[in-house]
Amino acid sequence: MRKHPQTATKHLFVSGGVASSLGKGLTASSLGQLLTVRGLHVTMQKLDPYLNVDPGTMNPFQHGEVFVTEDGAETDLDVGHYERFLDRNLPGSANVTTGQVYSTVIAKERRGEYLGDTVQVIPHITDEIKRRILAMAQPDADGNRPDVVITEIGGTVGDIESQPFLEAARQVRHYLGREDVFFLHVSLVPYLAPSGELKTKPTQHSVAALRSIGITPDALILRCDRDVPEALKNKIALMCDVDIDGVISTPDAPSIYDIPKVLHREELDAFVVRRLNLPFRDVDWTEWDDLVRRVHEPHETVRIALVGKYVELSDAYLSVAEALRAGGFKHRAKVEICWVASDGCETTSGAAAALGDVHGVLIPGGFGIRGIEGKIGAIAYARARGLPVLGLCLGLQCIVIEAARSVGLTNANSAEFDPDTPDPVIATMPDQEEIVAGEADLGGTMRLGSYPAVLEPDSVVAQAYQTTQVSERHRHRYEVNNAYRDKIAESGLRFSGTSPDGHLVEFVEYPPDRHPFVVGTQAHPELKSRPTRPHPLFVAFVGAAIDYKAGELLPVEIPEIPEHTPNGSSHRDGVGQPLPEPASRG
């Protein structure tokens, strides 16, 4: 017996056609945000058609960033969009890959759970996909059952890899009933400049391919660089057999935070609510309108250098970039991100050329030796000149290495980059040694997920957080070597936050009388930032960059540092302005 449609959890599937990178994830996130502000409890899920179990071991140039959830899952970057737009933490089950599905099915076959059946894509693979989709409708940790589950199906209709997921979605509709399932298809409407025409044929073919596997979309998102005229929307509705109210024009928006308003203007949320018989309230735009005003009407602009090794693909640092921008929103400031390849900062002259006109330096996470000396060089340059610095994960480790070299440990390094270094100020975590030695799987074995930390009460980070008890998400195998803490402290660097047992260094900083703002964290705070609730560390960092730009913290004139020479302690002094209270801004 099926549940009554007013009490059942509704499922909304988002597919894509014609081309990839049309913005399915942002469309799904924006619709989720719209339904949330209408008073509905929404959760989201991404189905990825690749055979990797998760993106944790994938090349950032191919996949982009790895988004880590509170429970320690390494997931697709779209899950980050979901969390930021819904303003809700999602579980690891919000990302399903073909690799996970096949691994589970094969493990069941080996255990004999299929009782001798011939294991096939249909029904065994599709049944496992359905199980994972339907599991998202279970109550969350607080006992709240979602009103709507939005599931984004990765890939493009017609891809071989996506077929099992589309078939599973079709079967979910058959199982739950048409009144409880909604299909939203995102398609490209290209503009041909020579003829001055918008072309609907690609969308017609894409919908035909979808219908050939048994799925008729309830609504179409038409992606274009301009508004699709009403006449063309009527034509598409007729040829694709879709209600005219379900044909949605979504021209390119100036900001991703404008997309919910675009969908609302086209009344997509109202159409979904009517079609699924959902309870609702009117949209309260107060908070989102304030965000959009901050996005489009900044009072000032600051330039932040993001010094990384994957800067050719900005998606590799997607959450970092969004957290920086959100930190700017708090101050009504626009953050211009300068993408700086770390290789170019190994020398003082290279660092000066890359960082000479920025107001802050951010060192993001990463792996491998390439570009490390450039990150350390960028920190040395910034520290000598009073530039604010924020280091994330590997960024903290680079701050520690630079500090160690400045007090005489000239060969200080990380065991990751130089296993034979005489001064491994960054060491392999004890439970990771077997993995680093190649004796265990790399995937899913790092220190992952949310862990607590205790901050020193009078520290810069405690001032930023406005508390001494924090919890952040992590993804690392290496830690500060406690045997070197006392020596490193001679540089002035302070270990201002640790794990509750005091063993693992979680935060480092220079006191305000040594440098206006140099903060490093072993965590990935960018993963918890929201556009309407920016992360306190990013708020404080952008605030320090604004002060630097305003001339409140003047650069220190120092003699030229010889090339390839570690930064000395004499280059640290001369700046003594305390960090302004971040809460007083914005």
From Swiss-Prot:
Please state how the activity of this protein is regulated: Allosterically activated by GTP, when glutamine is the substrate; GTP has no effect on the reaction when ammonia is the substrate. The allosteric effector GTP functions by stabilizing the protein conformation that binds the tetrahedral intermediate(s) formed during glutamine hydrolysis. Inhibited by the product CTP, via allosteric rather than competitive inhibition.
**Where along this sequence does the record place binding of CTP?**
S20, D159, I160, E161, K199, T200, K201, P202, T203, Q204, K235
Query: Under the GO molecular function aspect, what terms does this record hold?
Result: ATP binding; CTP synthase activity; glutaminase activity; identical protein binding; metal ion binding
The coiled-coil regions, if any, are none
Q: Which reaction does it catalyse?
A: UTP + L-glutamine + ATP + H2O = CTP + L-glutamate + ADP + phosphate + 2 H(+); L-glutamine + H2O = L-glutamate + NH4(+); UTP + NH4(+) + ATP = CTP + ADP + phosphate + 2 H(+)
Origin species: Mycobacterium tuberculosis (strain CDC 1551 / Oshkosh)
**Matches recorded under CDD domains:** CTPS_N, GATase1_CTP_Synthase
Pathway where it operates: Pyrimidine metabolism; CTP biosynthesis via de novo pathway; CTP from UDP: step 2/2
What Pfam family is a match for this entry?
CTP_synth_N
Q: Which residues form the active site?
A: C393, H524, E526
Give the span(s) annotated as Amidoligase domain. 1-278
Q: Which SUPFAM superfamilies match?
A: Class I glutamine amidotransferase-like, P-loop containing nucleoside triphosphate hydrolases
Q: Which family is annotated?
A: Belongs to the CTP synthase family.
> InterPro entries, per this entry?
Class_I_gatase-like, CTP_synthase, CTP_synthase_N, GATASE, GATase1_CTP_Synthase, P-loop_NTPase
The subunit structure is: Homotetramer.
Q: Where does UTP bind?
A: S20, K199, T200, K201, P202, T203, Q204, K235
| A cellular component term, taken from the record's GO annotations | cytosol
Specify which residues bind ATP according to the UniProt entry for this protein: S21, L22, G23, K24, G25, L26, D78
General function of this protein: Catalyzes the ATP-dependent amination of UTP to CTP with either L-glutamine or ammonia as the source of nitrogen. Regulates intracellular CTP levels through interactions with the four ribonucleotide triphosphates.
Q: Does the keyword Zinc apply?
A: no
- Provide the residue span(s) of the region labelled Disordered: 560-586
What protein am I looking at?
CTP synthase
Q: Where is the Glutamine amidotransferase type-1 domain?
A: 303-551
Query: Please, what other remarks does the record include?
Result: CTPSs have evolved a hybrid strategy for distinguishing between UTP and CTP. The overlapping regions of the product feedback inhibitory and substrate sites recognize a common feature in both compounds, the triphosphate moiety. To differentiate isosteric substrate and product pyrimidine rings, an additional pocket far from the expected kinase/ligase catalytic site, specifically recognizes the cytosine and ribose portions of the product inhibitor.
Q: Specify which residues bind L-glutamine according to the UniProt entry for this protein.
A: G366, L394, G395, L396, Q397, E416, R477
Q: Which GO terms describe its biological process?
A: 'de novo' CTP biosynthetic process; pyrimidine nucleobase biosynthetic process
